[in-house]
Amino acid sequence: ISRFAHYCREQRITLPEKNFSIRYRSNIPRHVGMAGSSALVTATLRCLMEYYEVIIPEEIQPNLILSVEADELGISAGLQDRVIQVYQECVFMDFDKDLMERQGHGTYERIDPELLPNLFVAYRTDLAEGSEIFHNTIRQRWLQGDPRIVEAMKWFAEFAQEARDLIVAGRGREIGPLLDANFDLRRSIYTLSPANIDMVERARSAGAHCKFTGSGGAIVGVYEDEAMYEAIERAFADTGILVLKPEIV
């Protein structure tokens, strides 16, 4: 709320004096890398914009949301989750450093969800750890210019670009190896819990390709057909891990 008020002051937007109260309710699983905390901030910003009839450009909203989490709540994170929540679509994000410095935000490209391959999501029903724990040491090493971390981040960006190019070209079914490469690289620089690694290995044992959705506790992957999806379900049977097919619109 304070960040919204500060933004309006900066933009010389006069807010009418009227009262409100905010109550939260969420069905997003906690601490499994599904951006539950940022969803609350995003929803609050959206409510404030509607209530006060203030228009904030879509490309600016993720920056504002992240500033709340980083500066007010001390959470180390990036813009990705906030971009998706603001745009509410499938989006390719370019965070090129020069571009970010020049325009103050990334370049966000909407992708037709009809071009996506078959996707599944699996998540743990027991609690994992918060993303602030997962990201803190890596962020610090990146800020310090650790060559290994800087190089890894370049590769993550390259994987995303290659996946985007395949999807836009109508070859979305070919992105599987890029998901595997993403996870393998992440595993090489982060300390991952055995339970989270087990999720990926179970999905791979069924022939699927997958990666974390976020900081751990949930994975997103691709599968070829219903036979493979059923094999994935069997791989997670009796583990307390739920598997579903996301509806992307």
Residue spans of the language-model regions?
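C-terminal nucleotide
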Residues: 1-16, 25, 63-76, 80-211, ...
